[in-house]
Amino acid sequence: LCHFVGKRLATSALLLTIAMGMLSAVGARADQANVTMILATGGTIAGKQAAAGQPGYVSGADSVKSLIEAVPELKEVADVEGKQVSDVGSQNMDAKLWLELLRATSEALARPEVDGVVIAHGTDTMEETAYFLNLTLKSDKPVVLVGAVRPATALSADGPMNIYNAVVVASSAEARGLGVLVVMNDEIHYAAEVTKTNTTNPDTMKSPNRGRAGVCDTGECVFFSPTTKRHTTNSAFSIGDNVASLPYVAVVYAHAGMTAAPIKGALDAGAKGIVVAGVGDGNMSDAALDALTAAAKTGVVVVRSSRVGSGVVRRNIEVDDDTRGFIAAEELNPQKSRILLQLALMTTNDVGTIQDMFHAY
């Protein structure tokens, strides 16, 4: 069962059902429960060690069938089906796999009997895949990304409980219309907000600016408030079946002593846009600033984000964005700024229009 704080969801019919003992536990499925589809892409959640307790493992070694069988309690929540989309560590996720996953997810959501989709995914780039799907899917049905920090064979593996909670959320009517979600470590996060914050701690996925969307607790989930960002059915972005790639956008990392070299490298590689992971409020050295200003004058779209990890990059504070023709990323980190810019460049290179997109999405 899922609900928003302060909102009563239970109907008298459901209360009567519970009173008659026909529902054995919170979150248990009704006889008429529809399908929750699990799409597996690989990642640590499907990883295997040579021996339990050893640090090394092979990512994506387990199949979607194994992931489902490891959590027999899922049958009390929903009728679960599985499909293997890929078996990669998420460091190897790319636009080709995103497009394949978008189409597999859309196909599943189009089935009337499917209530929602869970995507098992590595945590390294989970936030990027979630955000891409958040901008391109055209359904109000729940889509939940889930992963693990410990492989499936580890002592105290976190994957099984994460999958259970993800299926609870994906099968919930209350998760409809919220966009793509991430469920990890008993927490629910919106795709536009979430980021990975720790390399090895299961409590790694956080939403540093606006906070988590909700929580899960053994078959029950509670949502706190809806997101204010546009997504899914309210998104202007659309990916046709004939799209095979996305525009090349580079991310350059600012640091003390930064030169124009990484910017020149991005331009030489054919970048249509450049996102700066700037210091502080999206700042950079004078050398980098001059190189990016020159690039913007040639039509390359430049976005200032921040390497800090939280906060807002605003226009015209230390950098005169109006004069230089730059875009301020607002709340988006560099990796999500890159995705939004890639999608924006498929339809426009107008700086004002793209700045509005960074405000809306």
Residue ranges and their predicted role:
Residues 1-15:
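Bacterial N-terminal signal peptides that target proteins for export
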Residues 12-24:
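Bacterial N-terminal signal peptides
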Residues 26-30:
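Sec/Tat signal peptide C-region and signal peptidase I cleavage site
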Residues 31-108, 290:
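ATP/NTP phosphate-donor binding region
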Residues 32, 39, 43, 63, ...:
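Accessory alpha-helical/coil subdomains and C-terminal extensions
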Residues 119-141, 284-293:
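Short Gly/Thr/Asp-enriched flexible loops that form oxyanion-binding sites at enzyme active sites
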Residues 146-218:
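Internal gly/pro-rich beta-alpha loop/helix module
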Residues 281-361:
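C-terminal non-catalytic interaction/assembly regions of soluble proteins
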